[in-house]
Regions:
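Active-site acid/base region of carbohydrate-active enzymes
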Residues: 288-309, 343-346, 350, 359, ...
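An acidic- and aromatic-residue-enriched active-site/binding cleft used to recognize and process polar
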Residues: 102, 116, 126-130, 364, ...
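Secondary-structure transition/capping motifs at alpha-helix termini
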Residues: 88-90, 115-119, 346-351, 362-368, ...
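Substrate-binding groove/exosite segments of carbohydrate-active enzymes
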Residues: 218-225, 271-413, 466, 479, ...
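Non-catalytic carbohydrate-binding regions of carbohydrate-active enzymes
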Residues: 488-525, 554-716
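The feature captures the catalytic groove of carbohydrate-active enzymes
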Residues: 237-260, 265, 370-387, 403, ...
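Short, well-ordered alpha-helical packing segments
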Residues: 110-112, 124-130, 142, 151-159, ...
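Terminal accessory carbohydrate-recognition/targeting modules of carbohydrate-active enzymes
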Residues: 1-289, 614-618, 667-670, 685-748
């Protein structure tokens, strides 16, 4: 497999998300007009819905619509190729539309028309959009609507819900000079891409639109229809090309410039292909004999880029990865450390570094991190616990930077101080969960043990529960701060962080570990007693150095038990023997959006994979190594439709017995976990340490594995696995060979 084949490898017919890793994303969760030309279903500018973008219509010389019959569609990360057939005056016309969202926030339709037969035929292409204009309601309105030099431009003001309004400057036009145009205010009708609903069914005369701009009437509210038109003479068996584009940005001139650049390209959709190829060149190359693992590795890199934003506007000053599409199209603190773990393998660390810096840039006055950051305002109360310490140290093992450590140290120290001050009033070394939303794991039995109404209220100080997960996060943060302080020459601070981390470790071992059950449990701060509620988070200490030989049997007794967690598609977020357990997405009889009482969440699975693999390494336990490999394989295979290796997905949660995803939510490509970090560390066996790199592939029983272009501290690493042997190359030269189970330490 060649890198040039990667876009093609991911192609399929059942997908439609398009993005250029910037502000504009077209990923409608439930598209209604997918077969229509253009982009009529909703797009998102940042996390704000922007709809529609545009469609285009063919007319004959009398102004009647030429019917298009859609015959096939094929998607890949760079675009959608949609084919139609039309008939005009007895001539059959094959029409190919290539849709793409470019890195400069231009949604593009490249239209190729090719008539059959021996006669030329004239056709009119009208590209048009309809924008809501409701100034009296103060929800969505337009300003500065204008037509100039073939482009229509306008500023759209969007005020979703109670949020502050966001202004988007838009531009819309064709790649060829326009023959005519029209801008027309209308009372409301259905917002659909059907020519019969437009005002121009009566106004397109003599082969032209009226060339007017009518934006006033008895009242100002309604729909503003905007169109540009081009007449084309199609010659027999000859391709005629025309592109339609819609640009969005903060400034009108920027949108118009971006649109002009795109429309003047000979092959404008090539800008998208180049951008995606460049992205795949910027990460390690991986392939193996398991097509599920190979496909998912590259699919994951697609998902990370799809949800990346590089826009520098408002609260956003750095690049970062959003948690997902739609509502999730923002930096969200629970998922950001996972993005750091995966993006640290990119050749350039800027994106991984930006995930943390974005939250430090927007840190609260009390030291806490905001749970969700909008581009132009802050939401009140939202907060999520997250493992920033692990992500920071893992990033530093690949791309060490004193400058970066210095940039994040004070912010993370303030964050730790917030927890000590606000989340541990007993000074116990264990830290509080205040509501069931802030863990990112709502609707679980664990919270009801301290408050019977814990699932009734959402944000704020609802209850107090000393959580295993949040306490482990704080332990790893203070360990990381100790390392950072040492490297920054703050030796006294480093010693203090180590003492504080040791206090947390002791508290977890003494207060959360149940020697009889052989399980870590949350603690009720009112009684100081363990809750004895089994949740997948109870295994989180196993991915740290908190555990020792005493705890070995616990992971086997519970995690590998089919009656608790080792389901066909492990692991459920709550144990199968929990009284609130449900494999269906139901909580107390009602289907929910995000229940954690039995569904398999990729986010949990990433943590559990790390816990199981770390335990295998710590205990030097071959049976656990095999189980860890088995688990990662099951985890990845779960995220394919109908076990089809060509149709990967990543939804919020899955059924632990059937692997059925939460498709009813419409949220695919949800970056709320990490996968490629696991594949590189355990399938390929590359685990960077402070002064060396351990090469130790796990027993996945693969006939072939190859990873190349892994850059660690400026050195290039390549590893291949063939059966039970593996080989290492360093900087393009053969380094050494070994056998699975006999790891090699490479000094880098």
């Amino acid at each position: 497999m060649k890198r040039s084949d990667l876009i093609k490898r991911l192609s399929r017919t059942d997908k439609w998300y398009l993005g250029g890793a910037n502000r504009l994303l077209w990923a409608p969760p439930f598209p209604v007009f997918l077969d229509s030309p253009g982009f009529w279903d909703e797009a998102h500018y940042y996390n704000v819905e922007l709809k529609p973008l545009f469609t285009w219509t063919l007319l004959n010389d009398e102004g009647a619509e030429v019917t298009l019959t859609q015959i096939r569609r094929k998607w890949d990360p760079a675009g959608i190729r949609q084919e139609y057939i039309a008939k005009l005056k007895g001539v059959s016309i094959k029409i190919t539309e290539v849709k793409a969202v470019l890195p400069n926030d231009v949604a593009l339709s490249e239209v190729i028309l090719k008539p059959s037969g021996r006669r030329s035929v004239k056709v009119h292409v009208v590209a048009w959009t309809t924008q809501e204009h409701e100034p009296s309601k103060n929800t969505s309105w337009l300003e500065d609507v204008d037509y100039r030099s073939g482009l229509i431009s306008f500023r759209r003001h969007l005020r979703p819900s109670v949020s502050p309004q966001l202004e988007v400057a838009c531009a819309f036009g064709l790649s060829r000079p326009c023959n005519s145009h029209s801008i027309n205010l209308s009372e409301r009708t259905a917002l659909q891409p059907h020519w019969k609903l437009t005002p121009w069914t009566d106004l397109f005369k003599d082969g032209c639109l009226p060339g007017d701009k009518k934006l006033t009437g008895a009242h100002s509210d309604g729909l503003v229809y905007m169109a540009v038109h081009r007449e084309l003479l199609l010659r027999p068996a000859t391709e005629t090309r025309l592109s339609v584009g819609f640009a969005a940005s903060p400034a009108s001139q920027e949108s118009q410039n971006n649109l002009s650049v795109a429309l003047h390209q000979k092959d404008p959709s090539a800008l998208s292909r180049t951008s995606w190829n460049d992205h795949f060149l910027a990460v390690p190359f991986f392939e193996c004999s398991d097509e599920f693992l190979t496909t998912y590795y590259w699919y994951r890199w697609y998902g990370l880029k799809l949800n990346t934003e590089y826009g520098t506007e408002g609260n956003y000053k750095r690049p970062f990865v959003c948690e997902g599409i739609g509502y999730f199209r923002a930096p969200i603190s629970y998922s950001a450390p996972g993005h750091m773990l995966e993006n640290r393998w990119m050749h350039d660390p800027a994106l991984a570094q930006g995930s943390l810096l974005t939250f430090i840039d927007n840190q609260r006055e009390d030291g806490g991190f905001r749970g969700y950051i909008d581009v132009n305002h802050y939401r009140q109360e939202m907060f999520y616990h997250a493992n920033w310490g692990r992500a920071l140290l893992q990033l530093e093992t690949l791309h060490p930077s004193l400058e970066y450590l210095g940039a994040v140290y004070d912010g993370l120290a303030r964050y730790a101080a917030y927890f000590d001050r606000e989340r541990d009033e007993e000074v116990s070394g264990l830290y509080d969960i205040d509501n069931h939303y802030e863990t990112g794991q709502e609707y679980m039995h664990r919270y009801l043990e301290v408050d019977a109404h814990a699932d009734q209220d959402h944000w704020g100080s609802v209850f107090r529960l000393k959580g295993v997960d949040v306490t482990v996060y704080m332990y790893e943060l203070k360990c990381a701060l100790a390392v950072a302080a040492d490297r920054l020459g703050k030796s006294d601070a480093a010693e203090l962080w180590r003492l504080e981390a040791e206090k947390i470790k002791t508290a977890i071992l003494q207060k959360m570990w149940d020697p009889s059950d052989e399980m870590f449990y949350d603690v009720d701060p009112k009684t100081g007693l363990r809750t004895n509620v089994k949740a997948a988070t109870c295994f989180y200490p196993y991915f740290t150095d908190i555990v020792n030989e005493t705890h070995r049997n616990g992971v086997k007794r519970h995690l590998l038990n089919p009656r608790e967690y080792w389901t066909r598609f492990p692991v459920p977020s709550s144990s199968c023997d929990d009284k609130y357990f449900s494999d269906a997405p139901e909580w107390k009889g009602k289907r929910m959006n995000c229940p954690w009482n039995g569904r398999v969440w990729p986010m949990t699975n990433s943590h559990i994979a790390e816990a199981l693999a770390s335990a295998a390494v710590m205990y030097r336990d071959e049976s656990l190594r095999k189980r860890a490999a088995e688990f990662i394989l099951k985890f990845v295979r779960m995220m394919f439709f109908e076990a089809d290796p060509s149709r990967p997905n990543c939804f919020e949660h899955y059924n632990p017995f059937t692997g059925q995803p939460s498709a009813y939510r419409g949220v695919d490509d949800y970056q709320h976990s990490w996968v490629n970090d696991l594949l590189i560390k355990y399938v390929c066996g590359i685990r960077p340490e402070e002064f060396s790199v351990l090469i130790d592939p796990f027993p996945f029983n693969l006939s072939h594995v190859m990873i190349d272009d892994v850059y660690i501290r400026g050195r290039r690493l390549k590893v291949t696995v063939s059966g039970k042997r593996f080989t290492i190359w360093l900087d393009g030269k053969h380094h050494t060979e070994s056998t699975l189970g006999d790891p090699i330490q490479v000094q880098i």
